[in-house]
Design a protein with these regions (language model features):
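Short, acidic Ser/Thr/Gly-rich low-complexity loop/linker segments typical of extracellular
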Residues: 45-60
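Outer membrane beta-barrel strand-and-loop segments of large Gram-negative receptors
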Residues: 411-415, 461-463, 558, 575-633, ...
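Short acidic/polar hinge/loop motifs at secondary-structure boundaries
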Residues: 143, 169-195
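Surface-exposed extracellular loop regions of Gram-negative outer-membrane beta-barrel proteins
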Residues: 209-223, 264, 268, 280, ...
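N-terminal periplasmic accessory domains that precede
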Residues: 89-95, 105, 137-140, 174-175, ...
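Short, acidic, small-residue-rich periplasmic hinge/interaction motif at the N-terminus
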Residues: 39-43, 75-79, 91-130, 149-151, ...
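Outer-membrane beta-barrel signature, preferentially recognizing the C-terminal barrel domain
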Residues: 456-459, 499-502, 530-584, 601-615, ...
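Face-selective signature of the C-terminal outer-membrane beta-barrel domain
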Residues: 293-318, 343-493, 516-521, 575-576, ...
Length: 775
């Protein structure tokens, strides 16, 4: 199979795009501003072999033709159409004149659809819409159909955590999203069924495109103050600076934050053995973190088609502190046998260095995209726990446990993608390789509580892909094939564990069809993705929580694969999508007794089996005067979930769940206000059963001053304190787990000042994303 791909690679490099010419152009108006989404098509009588296209948001286009110097017509709403003769030796610069129709002094304007289907997914147009007045990038993304935002955590409904690109550059740190300003964003694309171009473990993609840079120096500073319901403050300061001149683009970022948050939880483990045994843990906890972040990047444009650059960043945690008390109890047949008070403190620190170099350009007819990456990540955490157990007889027992964990990960990765016009379409070929070395050390004092851990993981991952796209009239076709090989080696105390070391090889086909019917756009997709266990899930040692609760990984886990068939439909401000998935070797957190102790439960990951699921989503965003409602709802349903659960028939593990978000945006001339209500129903998702519906009410206020140079934002999250999460985990035929997380209401005030609006032009897309996510 590998030789098959290598042969294709040689053929790909050696072949010429027979009879095909590639023409490039840039369309602008009289003010030298790009004309986005202008139509480029052949003039009558000279259309043989010419394929129409559309300009991107920067006014740039590529056109393939088997004729030399074709004559094409350029048109766009609001401009006079223009005929030009294209040349292939340079970028064709085309200027359109405005054509404003006046009827009784009323200007007739065209409004772009809110939602559009791209060749890969659904596009939400932000530029010129009410979304530009969101309080921050996360708030904006929460208003995009299919995206769920909790704090700084993104989730694509029904598809899990996405990877994010900004201007084609892979985002490696959530801080890059947090510091992105909404009015700098042009559009957001959500891909729920990624094809062969993406790593097979990628289940969803968010692609953010921003506006172009201005010449000269630019500055953007934002200060944020947060108070939570406990009265604990947090502070964040972000400074972006850049300088753009000629072919050079320099950018720098400094970010600092001190954050505090409560972390109260309730956990109950129930085991139905000879007797019913129940362990309850009610944790009252708080955490704080001091975090510095810095990044430098430089780009150089070799010409209109080629650029290269480099970047380096540091993301640290100077101090991660946690403390709290866990109140526990053990019940046998509902009678309390003993009570536990567990006081703990934890301290940690971490540092992540990462870097990227890239080249993006052309060699002959071939487009070249190369990225090289490195990553160094070290984490340390120490914890001290004081347990006091009181028996029903009144006797007490005390125990002090100290744990220390150190993880050190290093990664090198490279990625090369070539593309060329082939058979009136476009063919892409990609190669990627990454190597990871991860050391983990975990010690416990006293040593008889749990076994320590000293492990080493070495993992090499190689992948290759082919992707072909072509248009047949109004029908767009894409097909791809990806091959991935993972060589995983696990060492315990420097000794190779052959039973736990594995080699995986998988093929991942993908295909899509897109077509319009009148003003309605349709897209049908097929793709498969894989979930490889994280290094945390593959660890071998046991982690001590308290004398009743322990956690462990499982080095014997197999990857889980999902095969997905999707349909999307869009019309103006309406969008619908549906997806059916077949999942094999689902990975779940299960429960068992720890070392046969009658009152100690071990949480461990296992492969459960196969099942089917479906999700349906409907979104609408009409405009009614100053009111801009945005409604998005999703239905999730699963069948034949493979986990057994005590006292619960299989049908009860397959109940549907519904989530809805209703954002009411009111755009007054002097203020923009948003009232957002979110709802999560009861139901099942995987082995998690939501046992109580959750409600969330958020408020946001946006005010721009000094020609939008000064922006004030006020946000209130979880105003009513009703966004708590109550879950039951189905963890085995003899076990039940109940887990509750409690929401925190916060008030946030932000002050932002910007000068000569700054956007980063860095075009490195990154390599080794699959390994970075698992690290």
């Amino acid at each position: 199979m590998k030789s098959f791909f290598i042969t294709l690679f040689i053929v790909f490099l050696s072949m010429e795009a027979y009879g095909q010419h590639v023409y490039k152009g840039h369309v602008s108006n009289a003010n030298n501003e790009p004309v986005e989404f202008a139509n480029v098509y052949a003039e009558t009588g000279d259309s043989s072999g010419v394929h129409g296209t559309v300009c991107d948001i920067n006014g740039d286009f590529k056109l393939q033709s088997d004729k030399e110097n074709p004559v094409v017509r350029i048109s766009s709403v609001g401009y006079v159409s223009k005929e030009v003769t294209l040349t292939s030796d340079t970028t064709n610069m085309i200027t359109l004149s405005q054509d404003v129709t006046l009827l009784n002094e009323v200007v007739i304007k065209a409004q772009r659809p809110q939602y559009e289907l791209s060749s890969e997914g659904m596009v939400t147009n932000v530029a010129g819409s009410i979304l530009e007045k969101s309080s921050d990038a996360y708030h904006l993304l929460s208003l995009v159909p299919g995206i769920e935002v909790k704090g700084e955590s993104l989730n694509v409904l029904g598809r899990g955590k996405p990877i994010v690109y900004i201007n084609g550059r892979l985002v490696r740190n959530e801080n890059e999203i947090a510091t992105l300003q909404p009015d700098a964003i042009k559009k957001v694309e959500v891909i729920t069924n990624p094809g062969a171009k993406y790593n097979a473990n990628v289940t969803s993609v968010i692609k953010i495109t921003t506006r172009k840079n201005s010449e000269g120096f630019a500055l953007d500073s934002k200060s944020t103050f947060v108070v939570n319901e406990k009265g604990r403050p947090s502070f964040m300061q972000n400074i972006l600076a850049g300088y753009h001149t000629g072919k050079w683009d320099f950018n720098g970022q400094l970010y600092g934050a001190y954050t505090q948050w409560p972390d109260d939880k309730y956990l109950a483990e129930v085991a139905h053995l000879d007797n019913k045994m129940e362990v309850r843990n009610n944790g009252v906890q708080s955490r704080s973190k001091t975090r510095p972040y810095g990044k430098l990047s430089v780009d150089y444009a070799l010409d209109d088609e080629s650029s290269l650059g480099a970047s380096v960043s540091y993301d640290g945690t100077l101090r991660l502190k946690g403390n709290g008390t866990v109140y526990g109890s053990v019940l046998t047949d509902d009678v309390t046998e003993e009570n536990l008070t567990s006081d703990y403190t934890s301290r940690g620190h971490s540092g992540i260095w990462s870097g990227n170099v890239y080249y993006l350009g052309k060699i002959g007819v071939f487009g070249v995209d190369f990225n090289g990456d490195f990553l160094w990540n070290k984490n340390n955490e120490d914890m001290s726990t004081n347990d006091m157990t009181t028996l029903s007889s009144g006797e007490t027992d005390k125990q002090n446990v100290n744990t220390s964990r150190t993880d050190l990960s290093r990664m090198l990765a490279g990625k090369l993608v070539l593309d060329a016009p082939v058979w009136k379409g476009s063919l892409s070929y990609g190669l990627e390789y990454s190597y990871v070395r991860r050391n983990s050390d975990y010690t416990v004092v006293p040593q008889d509580v749990v076994d320590g851990e000293q492990s080493l993981i070495k993992e090499g991952m190689g992948s290759m892909f082919l992707d072909y796209t072509r248009k047949f009239g109004k029908l767009s076709f894409q097909a791809g094939l990806r091959y991935e090989n993972v060589d995983f080696k696990y060492y315990d105390h420097s000794v190779l564990q052959k039973a736990q070391s594995k080699n995986y090889s998988e093929w991942f086909p993908s295909a899509s069809l897109s077509w319009p019917i009148h003003k309605v756009n349709f897209q049908l997709t097929y793709a498969s993705d894989i979930y490889r266990p994280s290094y945390y899930q593959l660890r071998d040692g046991v982690v001590y929580d308290n004398r009743y609760t322990y956690e462990s990984g499982n080095p014997f886990l197999d990857p889980s694969i999902s095969r997905n068939l999707g349909l999307s439909v869009s019309w103006k401000w309406l969008y619908f999508s549906g997806m059916f998935s077949r999942v094999t070797d689902e990975i779940c957190s299960m429960r068992q007794l720890y070392k046969d102790k009658p009152n100690a439960v071990l949480a461990i990951y296992e492969n459960a089996g196969d099942y089917n699921n479906m999700r349906l989503q409907l979104s609408a965003s009409p405009t009614i005067g100053i009111w801009h409602p945005r409604v998005s709802c999703m239905l999730y349903k699963q069948w034949d979930y493979p986990v057994e659960s005590y006292g619960t028939p299989a049908s009860s593990i397959n109940k549907p769940s519904v989530s809805c978000s209703i954002a009411n945006i009111f755009d007054f001339s002097w203020l923009t206000a948003t009232v957002t209500y979110s709802f999560q129903s009861k139901g099942n998702m995987g082995n998690v059963q939501i046992v109580r519906a959750a409600h969330d009410l958020d408020l946001s206020f946006y005010k721009a001053l000094l020609h939008k140079s000064l922006i004030l934002q006020l946000d209130v999250y979880d105003l009513l304190g009703t966004n708590d999460s109550y879950s039951r985990l189905h963890t085995g035929p003899m076990f039940e787990t109940y887990y509750n997380e409690f929401s925190t209401s916060t008030v946030t005030l932000s002050v932002r000042y910007k000068f000569n609006a700054l956007k980063n032009k860095y075009k490195g897309t990154g390599a080794g994303q699959a390994q970075k996510s698992r690290m």
